[in-house]
Amino acid sequence: MSKKATYPKVMCTQHPDSASKYISTQEEPGEAIEAAVVFGCDEYMPDYEGKATPYHQNVQIVSRFIEETDLIPGKDIFITPRAPSAAQENRFRQLMVMMSIAEANHGALEYSDVQAINEFVHPMTGTVGEILDAQQHMVDVGELAKKEFGVAMEVPRIIPLIEDAPALLHAKELAENTLLSWEKRFGAAPEKFRVFLGKSDSALSFGHVASTLSCKYAISGISELDLELDTSTGIIFGAGTLPFRGHLSLKNAENFFREYRGIGTITLQSAVRYSHDKGEAEALVRLAEERLPESPEIYSGEEKEEIVNLIGIFGARYNRIIREMSCTINQLAGLLPQQRDRLMHKGTGGYSRNVPDISGLVCLCRKDVGKELSASMPAEDLNLPRAIKFTGALYSIGLPPEFIGTGTALEEAREKLGEEACERLLKKYFPSLASDLSFASGYLDLNVASRFLPEACLKEIRKDIEVLRDTFSLKVQPEPSYRILLEMMQPDLLQAGTKGNCMDEEVSQLVCSTLTKMGKIRKALG
């Protein structure tokens, strides 16, 4: 069995983070062609998670590649759908997506001997059982397709997407136990297996620093596993362009590739393709092709222990503030434009995420750190919007979420873990934090933000910024055009952020237009 398996390096996705372009589901098959032909991506992810994507989109995309290009799906361009989670949405939608995978493969195998779709992504993965059940569903669909339509396809492999901090800390165990159980259930472990790590949702739940450390902890663990098992593992890293969501942009590429060494595939989301300067996305793709994968950083046992306690401290400080701001965030998020055809579920921002189970994180922390983290978590689900609108809402009131809880957590880490631990945080565990905060400071305006914040929150955030300004010599100078928009919209934004108030349609459109202009300036909706 070869350990030199290769994987696609750039996955184009349907994330709705572009500030400048709305893309309907009808346009997405054309977008898939553009991803490969114009941007140079070697993978495309049709997205069915929380999204009103037609079931036949997989078939449309594969057919159009065959009919309109010289690229062979499954060989020159990889189509990797994200199916819904049976636990979080419903099993019917998951099975329908799997049937569309079988239909797409049937069409491709009539054209050539290459199977078009060989993997699918499973979102919000928390347990081995979820992974194996979804894989079993794919096996069952494959058998049905063979019986009814004569489709003799190789069963596509699942890619678990791990998205919250506690799960990221157990990514190695989850992947290892999956592969061991896979062998028992299906007869043999797969030769290749990819894991998808998400930056955004862990940031929403635990803050920017805790999220970054959790992702890097997971990269280290899965890289260890690759050395220990026969199965060749690969890592997809999901990141947007703003620091809170991963800071994957051409300008920050050097920091990004150094920070997340060990990943094999990046996501090229909508913002970098449509809201950044022309040519930047293509240049980023070429850079990824040259750089990925790089040798991973493997943490020692002592380093892992220190990182976990840092995650606990930063996560607690962040959550203390966020739980007091949820109403404002939800109402502002509802005014941001919808850039893809989302399913509407609970929460203002549509398909939202639940508060994660933190027991898997608390048990790894020191007792005092774990206790503080537990106390910081909201007593009930806040129904916060999805990460893109969450991030966009906070940037739109002059408070980039990268700052929330970060300064006070840095002070607390110094007190509890010592000066050397903080030095390792800034120089080894998260060296690009300074550049992330420098970027975000161009959109920070506490005078505007103060109108939306409870006094207790404002006091904590002022302290955060004071500590960070001293530590990193930050120059808090909002871009003039951005500041003008913030100042101009204060009364209407304040109205939007006040519980119980409703806007008339004209004012709502004006606010939405102004928020969109702010997104265009920062080159991402969120």
Curated annotation (Swiss-Prot):
Q: Report if keyword Cell membrane is assigned.
A: no
User: What Pfam families does UniProt report for this protein, alphabetically?
Assistant: PEPcase_2
What is its cofactor? Mg(2+)
Q: Which gene encodes it?
A: ppcA
Which reaction is recorded as catalysed by this protein?
oxaloacetate + phosphate = phosphoenolpyruvate + hydrogencarbonate
Function of the protein: Catalyzes the irreversible beta-carboxylation of phosphoenolpyruvate (PEP) to form oxaloacetate (OAA), a four-carbon dicarboxylic acid source for the tricarboxylic acid cycle.
Alphabetically list the UniProt keywords.
Carbon dioxide fixation, Lyase, Magnesium
The family classification in the record reads:
Belongs to the PEPCase type 2 family.
The protein, known as: Phosphoenolpyruvate carboxylase
Q: Does the keyword Chloroplast apply?
A: no
- Molecular functions (GO terms): magnesium ion binding; phosphoenolpyruvate carboxylase activity
Judging by the UniProt lineage, the source's domain of life is Archaea
BP-aspect Gene Ontology terms: carbon fixation; oxaloacetate metabolic process; tricarboxylic acid cycle
What's its EC? 4.1.1.31
Assembly and interactions? Homotetramer.
